[in-house]
C-alpha cells in the first residue's frame, strides 16, 4: 500500500498528542504568566517562537523514529515530510491571520497587556473548530474523492482574489458579525481588564474584549476554510493534518507578539501566500495527471514564502534609505 494511503494515527498517539497540547496550554495559563496581564516583550515572544519551532521539529523526529521501526524507512520518510510540509503551509497561511489580529486590536485599541489572554482563548477556540473541520473534511474526502478537485479550484480562486485584493483593508464598521453582536447585546463603552462580561446594576454587559474574541474566532474560522483544504493537497491522513495544524496554531500567538509591530515590513508576504494557494490548488486539480513528490511541495512553499519575506525586507530598507 502506498505511504500516502496509510493513516498512521493509533489511539495512543492521539491520546498522547492531546495530553501534550493540554499540558502546554496549562503551563502557559498557570505557570508562564498567562494568568497575569502583562505586555509580552520581544524577547519573551522570540523565546516562545523558537520553543514551538523546536517542539514541532522534535515531534517530526519522534514521528520518524517511531514509524521507521513500526512501518519501515519509506513510510517514515513520507509521513515525516508530509508533517513538515503541512506545518509549513499552515504556519505560512496563519501569518495572514496575524495581520488580521493586528487590525482587530488596532480597531478596538486593545492595550498590549490585555492581548495575551484574548489570544489564548482564541487558540483554545481555534483548536476545537479546526478539529471538527479536519475530521469532517477527512470524512467527506474519503466518501467523495471529487471534493479534492473542488477544494483545488476553491484554493485557486482564493489565491487569485488574494492577489487582486492584497492591498485591500476591510472596514470593521461594516462587518456583519460585529454589527449583529452590537445590535443584540449590551456592550460597555470601555474595557474592564481581561473580563469578557461584567454586571452593572444587576444586568450582565459584554465588554469590548468579548467583541475582540468573537472577531478573532471568526477570522480563524475563515482562514481555516483556506488552510485545511490546502493541506489535503499533501495528505489526507487525519493525524498528520491535525498535528501540523495544532503546532501552527500554538505558535501563532507568539509569532503575533514578535512580528505585530513589524507587520508593515512584510507587505509582499500576502502575494507570496496567494502564489502558494494557487500552486497548491493547481496541484490538487492536476493530481490525476501530475504527481508531485512531497519534497517538491515543501521546497516550493518554503521558497516562495522565504523569497516574499526577504524581498519585502529589501524593498522596505530601500524605501527607508530614500526617505532619509
Language-model segment annotations:
Residues 1-324:
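Multi-pass alpha-helical transmembrane bundle typical of ion/small-solute transporters
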Amino acid at each position: 500500500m502506498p505511504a500516502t494511503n496509510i493513516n498512521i494515527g493509533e489511539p495512543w498517539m492521539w491520546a498522547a498528542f492531546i495530553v501534550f497540547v493540554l499540558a502546554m496550554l496549562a503551563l502557559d495559563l498557570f505557570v508562564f504568566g498567562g494568568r497575569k496581564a502583562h505586555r509580552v516583550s520581544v524577547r519573551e515572544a522570540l523565546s516562545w517562537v523558537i520553543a514551538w519551532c523546536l517542539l514541532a521539529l522534535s515531534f517530526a523526529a519522534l514521528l520518524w523514529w517511531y514509524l521507521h521501526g513500526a512501518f519501515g524507512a519509506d513510510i517514515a520518510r513520507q509521513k515525516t515530510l508530509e508533517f513538515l510540509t503541512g506545518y509549513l503551509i499552515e504556519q505560512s497561511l496563519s501569518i495572514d491571520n496575524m495581520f488580521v489580529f493586528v487590525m482587530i486590536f488596532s480597531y478596538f485599541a486593545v492595550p498590549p497587556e490585555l492581548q495575551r489572554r484574548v489570544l489564548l482563548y482564541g487558540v483554545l477556540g481555534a483548536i476545537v473548530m479546526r478539529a471538527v473541520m479536519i475530521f469532517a473534511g477527512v470524512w467527506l474526502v474519503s466518501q467523495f474523492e471529487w471534493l479534492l478537485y473542488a477544494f483545488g479550484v476553491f484554493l485557486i480562486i482564493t489565491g487569485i482574489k488574494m492577489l487582486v485584493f492584497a492591498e485591500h483593508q476591510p472596514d470593521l464598521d461594516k462587518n456583519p458579525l460585529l454589527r449583529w453582536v452590537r445590535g443584540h447585546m449590551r456592550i460597555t463603552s470601555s474595557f474592564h481588564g481581561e473580563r469578557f462580561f461584567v454586571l452593572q446594576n444587576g444586568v450582565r454587559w459584554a465588554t469590548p474584549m468579548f467583541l475582540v474574541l468573537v472577531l478573532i474566532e471568526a477570522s480563524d474560522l475563515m482562514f481555516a476554510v483556506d488552510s485545511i483544504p490546502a493541506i489535503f493537497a499533501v495528505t489526507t491522513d487525519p493525524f498528520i493534518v491535525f498535528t501540523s495544524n495544532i503546532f501552527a496554531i500554538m505558535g501563532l500567538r507568539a509569532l503575533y507578539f514578535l512580528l505585530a509591530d513589524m507587520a508593515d515590513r512584510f507587505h509582499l508576504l500576502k502575494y507570496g501566500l496567494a502564489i502558494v494557494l494557487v500552486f497548491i490548488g493547481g496541484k490538487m486539480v492536476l493530481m490525476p495527471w501530475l504527481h508531485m513528490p512531497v519534497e517538491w511541495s515543501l521546497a516550493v512553499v518554503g521558497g516562495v514564502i522565504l523569497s516574499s519575506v526577504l524581498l519585502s525586507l529589501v524593498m522596505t530598507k530601500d524605501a527607508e534609505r530614500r526617505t532619509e
